[in-house]
Amino acid sequence: MTVTKDTVIGDLLDRNADTAQFFFAIGMHCLGCPASRGETIEEACAVHGTDADALVAAINDFLKKY
């Protein structure tokens, strides 16, 4: 799986729950909330003041190990 800024967080977590650590690191601790699971990575980054491109790159680097 390749992650983009348009990837829905819930879909990503369903495929690899270990990616939750990246969202916790940006202060997104409500991953079980239906609203957050429906957000894209870009939307979550906008709310949490984080660079979406950097987060996507970090997640993709992590996923390459699988």
Question: What are these model-predicted stretches?
Answer:
Residues M1-Y66:
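Domain-level signature for proteins that mediate thiol-based redox and metal-cofactor handling
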